[in-house]
């Protein structure tokens, strides 16, 4: 989306040069926004959002509406997926906006990792 800096979601946030003012790896909240064109074929189907690796706590909004939360999970715990039913909030056949807030501030000794995978939508059979 306009006004946002693109970053690689397959690498830890702290490995991409975003340091705090003192030069240390950033620790705190990260915001991610994704625009997704959801195919009209999804109409009437259950739609799940899956982020295979997100460290350490995450909240999700779809088209400006709160969708849910994945509670804090230590960074070393795997799998670290965030999977949520977003069916009532998605508009199939249109562009949709997904926002994820990731909090990495619960452990000051841990640098911000954030999303480390490509997210995807699917419809269970």
What are the residue ranges of the model-derived segments?
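An acidic-aromatic loop/edge-strand motif
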Residues: 1-16, 20, 72-73, 79, ...
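Aromatic-lined ligand-binding clefts that engage carbohydrates, nucleic acids, or primary amines
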Residues: 4, 28, 36-64, 98-102
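Generic marker of residues within folded, mature protein domains
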Residues: 24-26, 39-41, 50, 74-76, ...
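Short beta-strands within extracellular/lumenal beta-sheet-rich domains
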Residues: 25-39, 81-84
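Short hydrophobic beta-strand segments in globular cytosolic domains
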Residues: 67-68
